[in-house]
Amino acid sequence: MRLAAVDIGSNTVHSLVADVVKGQLVEVAHYVEMPELGVQVARTGSIGARAKPAIRALRAVVARARTHGFDVLLACATQAVRQADDGADFARSAGDAIGTTVHVISALREAELSFLGVASRHAVRREWAMVDLGGGSTEVVIARGREMQRSVSLPIGSGVLASTYFSDPPKPEERARMRKAALRELTHAPDGEVERLVATGGTASNLPFVLTHRNPPPVLTTADLLTCEARLDRARAAQVAKTVGLPANRVKAMRAGIEALLLCLDWYGLAVLQISHEGVRQGMLLAYLERGNDWWR
């Protein structure tokens, strides 16, 4: 069976195509566009004029996914659409554009689906933490093995933080203000004596490639994160983008995302970050295999 998942996030729109082989997911293709809905929603409370470019981006990633063929297409929207005054209308228009229902999932369900994807590869027996750092929110889960113990959704997302606090490139005093604001929210994170922290989301999955495109590491130390921060801050985003091979808007978001990940490591008393390329899309597909059309509830 071949499945596809689309998620409309606060920074990005992704499509994933995967085969189901002996109950496991094997990735076939992955596509992404960056319509950045979260920044618009944070500023105005609605998606408004950003709806058309976002739906164009959605159509683009689904069209690329269709070239591989699939049996089922699942779609969800997260924080930006959840928060927007016109989110329900946007979700209906998005669903019409791609021919399937776009479910606006709750913050709890987003955390559960992200965890399902991450735990399929990274779960350990003892207590561990997952951080899904998105463009508009961060889901934090404390778990044992593949069982969620506690979770919370925090209003600290890389795209919104970057647009709120940073110029291009960020100044030291801007980073200090952003850290202070993010730390206020992080005090609501669930407590835990965790032995590992696993990060997923756009910042986390792209950071290894900022270090090196040849054998990007699956684990990053605090020193690695600080090296990435220095590389992303050394010039304007458009110039940095050419050297690291990422879009300029991604560079801008990652500048704030790194700061959030450093704060999370410090919060849990760790110095090493595990990187997961699995997340909400893999969780959507695994939930579909378990629960069929109720995967999003």
Ranges and model annotations:
Residues D71-A75:
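Conserved beta-strand/loop subsegment of P-loop NTPase cores
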